Every structure is written in C-alpha cells, then in structure tokens.
Amino acid sequence: MEKNLTTGSVLKSILYFSLPYLLSYFLQTLYGMADLFIIGQFEDISSITAVSIGSQVMHMITVMIVGLAMGATVNIGQAIGAGNKKKAAKDIGNTVTLFMMLAIAGAAGLLFFIRPIVGMISTPQEAVSETVIYLTICFLGIPFITAYNIISSIFRGIGDSKSPMYFIAAACAINIILDYLFIGGLHMGAAGAALGTTCSQTISVMIALVVIMKKKTGISLSKNDFKIERKTINRLLKIGIPVALQDGFIQIAFIIITIIANRRGLDTAAAVGIVEKIISFLFLVPSSMLSTVSALGAQNIGAGKRERAQRILYYAVIITVGFGVMISIIIQFIAEPVVGLFTENAKVILLGSQYIRGYIFDCIFAGVHFSFSGYFCACGHSELSFIHNIIAILLVRIPGVYITAKVFSSLFPMGLATVGGSLLSVMICVIAYVWMKKKQGCMD
C-alpha cells in the first residue's frame, strides 16, 4: 500500500524512507564492489582494470536510467500526495511503456558501438579485450536493469522504499555466489563478473514482478494506462530529462577523469578505479538523501505543504554534512588499508591512498548539493540541478583534474579538484534556493 509521508515528524519520515533507500544503495553498490573484490583475488591487474572501466560505463548508463525515472517518482509522488490515484495509475502505465521502448533501443545501439566506446575511453591495451567482453554481456542485460529501476521508482513514488530493498538484496546475494562460481571456479575473468551481475539482475526483476502481482498498492491499472499519452510523458520527461542529462554528464566527467588516469599508466588507472568504487560506497548517504528529499518533497508539495518540504531539505543537509565530516576524518587515518582490500600491489595502494585522501572531502559538499537537487526535482525544477552540475563540471572539475594530473606526481591534488567542483555547486544551489523562495518556488 502507498505510504502517506505528509504528516507526522519530519525527521521520522526521513528516517522511515531513507534507511531502506540507504540499504538499497548499499546493496546495489556491493554489485560493483563484489565484482572488483572477487576478481582481484583470482585474476591479474588487466582483469581488474577491465571490470573497473567497464563498470564505470555501466554505472553511467544506470544513473541516467535512474535520473530519467526520477520524473516518474516525482509525478507519482505528487499524485499520491494530492490523492489522485487515477493520475498515479496513468503515470505508472506510461512510465513502463516508455522505458521498455528506450531500453530495447538503447541496448541495440550500445552493442553496435561497443568498440568505439572502449576506444574512446582510452582503455589500456592490456585490458581492451576483456573490457569489450564485459560490456557486451552487460549491454545485453540493459532491459533488465531498466525494468528493475522502473519498478523501484514506482514503489518509491507511492512511498514504499522497502520493497526495492528486498529486490536488490536477493540480487546481491545471487551476484556474489555467481561471481565466485564464474570467476573463482570457472576462471571466466571479466566475462564472469559481467555474467554474474546480469543474471542476478534478471532474477531480481522476476522477484519484483511476482511481488507486484501480489501486493496491494491501492492503485488499479488498466490497459489504457499503458497507452502513451503525450501530456503524461511530457510531465515525466520535464523532470526526468534534466536529471538524466545531469547524471550522464557527471559520469562523463568521471570517465574523462578515468581517461586522464589511464594515460598515466596501468597503476594509476587501477588506483583511480578502485577509489571510485570506494567513493561510490561512501556516497550512499548523500545519494539516499537526494532520492529521499525528491520523493518526500514531491508528496508534500502535491499535498500543498511546501514549508514541510523545505524542512525535509534542511534535515537532509544536516544529516549529510555530519556524515561527510565524520567519514572524511576517518579516511585520513585508514586510507591504505581500505585501498589494500582490493589489491596487493604496493604502487596501486600508494596512489589510491593519495587520491582518496583528497577526494573524500567531496562527501561533505556533495551531500549538500545532492539534497538541494532532490528538492529542486520535487518542486518540478530539475533544470536547476542540471545547471549547477554542468557549470561545476565544465569550470572546475574537469579542468582541475587535468591540470593537477599534469603538474603533480601525487594524486592527492587530483582528488581535491573534484571537491572544488562540488563546492561551486553548493554556492549555486544556495543562490537558486534563495531565488526560489523569493519567487514563491515550487510553482510550475
């Protein structure tokens, strides 16, 4: 059943919704980390690099799917908050139709251009063949990745963040088992990592479909709801496209950083790839707050409770800043052991510890602008989220990483360059928020 999150304690509502979301993100992150950890125990550095680079490409695709699905979460949430279940049903049906069409077309296109993609990201020659195999298998699984994220966005839109957690928990457990089978037992290398991930995601979707058929959501769907309606699609895309583009550009920035790292050699490429995995794990709290603020904010805005939506934003900022400060201090003392979990190569550990000691401060500032981005999406102004991220990427993040990589032998300054981009984003978000309040924001 849908959960009404427009009444009661704001903090309790955030915790009720965000904790399952946080656990979902944690489990989903274990996908990539498990692949990298397990392949590091059985294969050489070229296989590690192939999985690291390939998983970054897949992460970019996945976050763009999730970003586009944000339009569904917000629209469904606003409909639920307003008590309009007919509109919610239409939003759900059109979301399913649109996304499955995009998934099939997208998978076909990516498979066709797989070689240029691998070449474009400057994959080290030693890792090219395994990267191609890894991505081929993963691209074939895109319809299932899309299906999972559609289902999750629908559940979160109606206020249920627990069901997606159960789906991903099952998939994660299966993925780890299959990784040990395919990589450790059958010695399939990067192909085994990709196959384990794709198979487990497929099983997750099957479990989700069974749950949907049995679960009482309070929303009745008809065949007519699945017919494309331009007004409904436009509302979904108005919010979803800016978020998807934003997430895509962020991942492109990370891929450019990977290219810069790749050109410094295999050791640097492996170090940066490992740290990106660790950071993706530590970013669980900021990421969960973005989604929590957008979903809870949408319900409250739909119910006409704008001040409550603003309080949700304030609490989210406090939570993320507190977490960011704490984890930034801790990492300064344990950087080497953390990086060492993924490799025994002393040079990679040294470079990785340098990079993460600078990069980790991004947890503080990213948490703030993630929370603001969630609020902007809930208000229907996702273009603001897109704008601040693009400005930060083009003016600070990419130029900063390029310059520091050229000037310094240590990777610490390269990590700080990323932090500078987030700091600029925070400044822009605060200005935009003040402007929205003056203009009585959250208005279409």
Predicted feature descriptions by range:
Residues 16-35, 137, 171, 200-204, ...:
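Transmembrane helical elements of multi-pass membrane transporters/channels
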Residues 30-49, 118-125, 181-188, 248-275, ...:
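Helix-terminus/linker motif at the lipid-water interface of multi-pass membrane proteins
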Residues 7, 11-30, 34, 57-64, ...:
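Residue-level signal for short hydrophobic patches within transmembrane helices
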Residues 43-56, 135, 194, 266-281, ...:
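Small-residue hotspots at the loop-to-helix junctions and early N-terminal turns
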Residues 48-108, 145-164, 258, 271-335, ...:
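Small-residue-rich hydrophobic transmembrane alpha-helices
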Residues 28, 32-39, 62-69, 73, ...:
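Alpha-helical transmembrane segments and their lipid-water interface positions
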Residues 1-18, 76-141, 185-241, 297-362, ...:
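Short alpha-helical transmembrane segments in multi-pass integral membrane proteins
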